[in-house]
């Protein structure tokens, strides 16, 4: 799902979801990604579900996908052991909760809720259930 180094991309068919950060990275790092994959063009998918179907059917050899999504999808596949997540060395992405600027009351409640989940171990259980880590 992720490639350990750019060298293993040579001639491989790589899938990516349209509009995703992975699709942006293909264009952002052409020497690292685009110039190495088959026909210098990834196979674009409207959903990761469709990409996983092609990955399972060997129509693509890899899928450029954020590890959060990869782990989530793998947890919900019938045979997750058929796949392997490999860190690519691409920059990490961070996720956030968006709220209206200046709304400190909502921010405080969200922060308190997340902290409560962390302290009670529930956040770790959620991560394990949905993302396998």
Show which residues each predicted segment covers:
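Proline/Glycine/Serine-rich low-complexity intrinsically disordered segments
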Residues: 1-133
